[in-house]
Regions:
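Residue-identity detector for glycine
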Residues: 11, 18, 33, 45, ...
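Asp-based, Mg2+/Mn2+-dependent phosphohydrolase catalytic module
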Residues: 5, 9, 65, 72-85, ...
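Substrate-recognition element of Asp-dependent hydrolases with the DxDx(T/V) motif
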Residues: 34, 38-71, 87-94, 137
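A short alpha-helix capping/helix-coil boundary motif
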Residues: 14-18, 53-55, 89-91, 111-114
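Active-site neighborhood of HAD-like aspartate-dependent phosphohydrolases
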Residues: 1-47
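Metal-dependent phosphoesterase signature
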Residues: 13-32, 57-66, 81, 93, ...
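Sparse recognition of residues in long alpha-helices and their boundaries
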Residues: 26-27, 50, 83, 153
Length: 162
């Protein structure tokens, strides 16, 4: 079985200060420490998987295509640095608009990744800046690491056991 680091997108990988929704490529600001931390996680043998709530789709603030453009640009920027994100999963729903099973704190997107990539939850972690990220992790047996929004991702390294 493989091990993985599951990462929330906005507030963990991307700086979301001053904006609740990030849906334009011009708004991409990678948080401090992200590049170095992702390289370290990769060197430790972890797959990197993004799990993100994108409720702005359900609220018709932006589209799935906007989210795909952000992920495509992120993929490009990370690949330049030699970083491979194994997969990007996102929930397009919002609880104010419709109920679903994939919006964190529900663990469906994490469960899909666990099954698809044969990941051992006991050796894997979820890093998020919101209580719901950690709740989703706990529901499937992952260790959850809560950081402050836009915190330097290198700060979590002492909490990751390879």
């Amino acid at each position: 079985m493989q091990k993985a680091i599951f990462l929330d997108r906005d507030g963990v990988l991307l700086n979301d200060a001053g904006q609740y929704y990030i849906y334009k490529t011009d708004d991409i600001i990678i948080n401090n420490g992200v590049i170095d931390a992702l390289k370290r996680f990769t060197d430790m043998g972890f797959l990197l998987i993004v799990i993100s709530n994108q409720g702005g789709i359900a609220k018709q603030i932006y589209t799935k295509e906007d989210v795909e453009k952000i992920h495509s640009e992120l993929k490009k920027q990370f690949e330049i640095e030699g970083i491979n994100i194994t997969e990007y999963y996102y929930c397009p729903h919002h609880s104010d608009v419709e109920k679903c099973l994939c919006r964190k704190p529900e663990p469906l997107l994490i469960e899909k990744a666990l099954a698809r990539f044969n990941i051992d939850p006991d050796k894997s972690f979820m890093i998020g800046d919101n209580k719901r990220d950690i709740e989703a992790a706990k529901k499937v047996g992952l260790s959850g690491i809560k950081i402050k929004p836009n915190q330097n991702l290198l700060d979590v390294l002492p909490h990751i056991n390879a």
